[in-house]
């Protein structure tokens, strides 16, 4: 309602502002300054309204939290009920419609020891039946629950120890199997390595034989090549000697021919002289 009145007042005030042409004095009334101030004032009003709403919302939220805190002590969680609670349960079932308890179906479901149940206690309950006995029974239930929890923890620890022991045995068996597999793998690796070494040795011997054959063939080819070179050198030397001889013979023949030509020329000249003398 407060918010409604506040909004109504704001709307009426906005109507008044829209009806006025401007406010101020002197130079502030000139031009569009009145509209600018109206806008600024509207922004301020909006901020104030938001602050008021946020404060109102937080106060409502705090009131809601206080109500929850008032109701929460009246809610209790139970883990199990035994057959010794028949009196307390009968009283609770008789006062189910008056004291605001849960229905019989929910209570029957809650009697299972493995399921927790929630009892909503009303603030205006007038019939208080054997609260002390119920508290004692609830304390006993809590102690039994703690003992059961300790027993379950001990059993879980023993189970964990057994599981760890079985796990260690399985790990040891796995390690033995892995060791045996590793030994077998090592044996297989050794056998394969031996076969590979033998194969490589055979291949090496074969390659050595082939290299020896190639070396011998290369040596024989080199010897043949050397013999051919020697033969060619000898032939070359013979040819050179023959060419020298032919050249010398040709030179001697040329000299002889020149001498013969000169002698013939001298004889012709002599014959010409003799003929001239005879004609005279």
From Swiss-Prot:
Residues 169-187 have a biased composition (Acidic residues). It comes from the Eukaryota. It is a single-pass membrane protein. It is found in: Membrane. It holds the Pfam family Zein-binding. Residues 188-280 form the GTD-binding domain. One of its GO terms (molecular function) is myosin XI tail binding. The keyword Metal-binding does not apply. The chain crosses the membrane at residues 22-42. Keywords: Membrane, Transmembrane, Transmembrane helix. GO terms for cellular component: membrane. Residues 153-187 are annotated as: Disordered. This is Protein FLOURY 1-like.
């Amino acid at each position: 309602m407060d918010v409604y009145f506040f909004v109504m007042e704001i709307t009426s005030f906005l109507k008044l502002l829209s009806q006025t042409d401007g406010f101020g004095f002197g130079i502030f009334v000139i031009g569009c300054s009145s509209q600018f101030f109206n806008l600024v004032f509207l922004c301020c009003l909006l901020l104030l309204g938001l602050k008021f709403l946020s404060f109102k919302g937080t106060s409502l939220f705090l009131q809601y939290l206080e109500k929850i805190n008032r109701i929460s002590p009246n809610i209790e969680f139970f883990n199990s009920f035994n057959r010794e609670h028949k009196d307390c349960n009968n009283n609770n079932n008789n006062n189910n419609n008056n004291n605001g308890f849960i229905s019989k179906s929910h209570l029957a479901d809650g009697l299972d020891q493995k399921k927790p149940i929630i009892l909503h206690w009303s603030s205006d309950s007038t019939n208080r039946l054997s609260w002390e006995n119920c508290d004692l029974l609830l304390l006993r239930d809590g102690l039994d629950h703690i003992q059961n929890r300790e027993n379950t923890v001990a059993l879980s620890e023993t189970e964990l120890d057994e599981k760890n022991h079985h796990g260690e045995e399985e790990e040891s068996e796995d390690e033995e199997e892995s060791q045996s597999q590793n030994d077998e793998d090592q044996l297989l690796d050794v056998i394969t390595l031996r076969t590979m070494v033998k194969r490589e040795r055979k291949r090496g011997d074969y390659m050595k034989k082939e290299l020896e054959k190639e070396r011998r063939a290369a040596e024989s080819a080199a010897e043949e090549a050397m013999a051919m070179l020697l033969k060619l050198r000898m032939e070359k030397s013979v040819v050179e000697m023959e060419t020298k001889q032919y050249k010398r013979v040709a030179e001697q023949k040329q000299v002889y021919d020149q001498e013969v030509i000169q002698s013939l020329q001298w004889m012709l000249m002599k014959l010409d002289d003799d003929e001239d003398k005879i004609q005279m």
